[in-house]
Amino acid sequence: PVCERSIASTSQMLDPRTGQWSREVLTAYGLKENHFAPLVASGTVTGTLTTGAKIIAVAGHDTQCASAAMPCAEEDVEHTAFLSCGTWSLLGTELDTPILTADSCQSGLSNELGANGKINYLKNIIGLWLIQESRREYKRRGQAYSFAELEQQALAAEPLRSFIDPDAPEFVAPGDLPGRIQEFCRRTGQPIPETMGAVMRCIYESLALKYRYAIEQLSAVTGRTFTTLHVLGG
């Protein structure tokens, strides 16, 4: 058995500078390197099937697979950011070397190894979980709608009326997210989104603003100016 580096880097036990297990972290937890499978790069041939077909280690982290397919010329990398948008949203850019500064840590930015040996420098944001879980709650109440129907209701609602912080702790657990969104708006002195469309609009616009904020953080720490954002699926 082997462990592909991109998925290993999400464990927080990999040193992004060396691409190897961090002895400092392992020692702190009483672990040894031989507790883990040997590390390999994505694309490594690790064996063959009885039919002769090669067994190849792919990028085990789905976001790294998605970002590897990003249509970006080498000369445009420094001005390009990506947003892998699913239940979670991961917004970042590609670097040659990790950034391990205090500003980086305080901004909640992480260094994950990509499928091509580069660093995917990114921020984790709660994403379409807010839509998914709100839809489940409305269905539980007897109001079953498709995602397309929810989008249409959001489009029909008044814009730029109420906002939430998608990463606020009260939105992490399953349950009555529409009710929690209304309570957040009540607590922060904003208009309360009463209808389903208003709740959906609040979520979509809040995510858009959170993505903008993350891009500004990314730009401040890296010193880069981003002119292109590729939206991907992980």
Question: Would you name each region that the model predicts?
Answer:
Residues 1-2, 7, 12-28, 50-229:
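Active-site core segments that coordinate phosphate-bearing ligands/cofactors
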Residues 41-48, 226-234:
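Glycine-rich phosphate-binding loops at beta-strand->alpha-helix junctions
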Residues 23-44:
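A conserved helix-loop-beta module that forms one wall/lid of the active-site cleft
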